[in-house]
UniProtKB/Swiss-Prot annotation:
InterPro entries: ClpP, ClpP/crotonase-like_dom_sf, ClpP/TepA, ClpP_His_AS. Fourteen ClpP subunits assemble into 2 heptameric rings which stack back to back to give a disk-like structure with a central cavity, resembling the structure of eukaryotic proteasomes. SUPFAM superfamilies: ClpP/crotonase. Its main location: cytoplasm. The active site is at S120, H145. One of its GO terms (cellular component) is cytoplasm. This is ATP-dependent Clp protease proteolytic subunit 3. Gene3D superfamilies: 2-enoyl-CoA Hydratase, Chain A, domain 1 (3.90.226.10). Its EC number is 3.4.21.92.
Length: 216
């Protein structure tokens, strides 16, 4: 059996092991209208303001939700920016690339904002926002590294999976070099191990464009 999922070692030790938010946990916003009151969960209300969130590990389910939200917002208004808030330790490379490809394909600019931690695929998506609109809050942390993975089974199966991980590593490094302006050699060197940056260091590196002190 082959484990094809590329994983990131900074797991929930960087984030609390929180349960999935249910109806009794998510804050609810009540709006008044001529037809009476309407209740929205907070994320649905923010979606109306074109604000979406990546606040967990990256997986296929999260990718499907974010892709759907971006496509919906593009259909609503193909010109107005979409804001993507990121607080994620990373996760599946293929799921992350699905989000990334959609960010590049939709017409609206994607404003990325790091709050908390953007690590591994989270940092990659942060850097993949529209140029000049990649932001971070002052006490957030950003980390880049190479994809990890594991395989088991016959030797030939392990070899196939190793080649796939190397392919994904090359793909991510090339894209990071494109988005940061760093050389491919430097990206390869810096991602060989966990490479943590402060927001200001991320600006100097080219991962983001600005540290913001106010959300207004």
């Amino acid at each position: 059996m082959i484990n094809t999922k590329c994983i990131h070692p900074v797991q929930n030790k960087w984030k609390g092991d929180l349960p999935c938010s249910g109806p009794g946990v998510l804050p609810t916003v009540i709006e008044q209208s001529g037809r009476g009151e309407r209740a929205f969960d907070i994320y649905s209300r923010l979606l109306r303001e074109r604000i979406i969130f990546l606040g967990t590990d990256v997986n296929d389910q999260i990718a499907d939700a974010l892709v759907a939200q971006m496509l919906f917002l593009e259909a609503e208004d193909p010109e107005k920016d979409i804001q993507l808030y990121i607080n994620s330790p990373g996760g599946s490379v293929t799921a992350g690339l699905a989000i990334y490809d959609t960010m590049q394909q939709v017409n609206p600019d994607i404003v990325t904002m790091c709050y908390g931690l953007a690590a591994s695929m989270g940092a990659f998506l942060l850097a993949g926002g529209s140029k000049g609109k990649r932001l971070a809050l002052p006490n957030s942390r950003i980390m880049i590294h190479q994809p990890l993975g594991g395989a088991q089974g016959q030797a030939v199966e392990i070899e196939i999976q190793a080649k796939e991980i190397l392919f994904l590593k090359e793909t991510l490094n090339n894209l990071l070099a494109e988005h940061t302006g760093q050389s491919l050699e430097k990206i390869s060197e810096d991602t060989d191990r966990d490479h943590f940056l402060s927001p200001q260091e991320a600006v100097e590196y080219g991962l983001i464009d600005k540290v913001v002190n106010s959300l207004n």
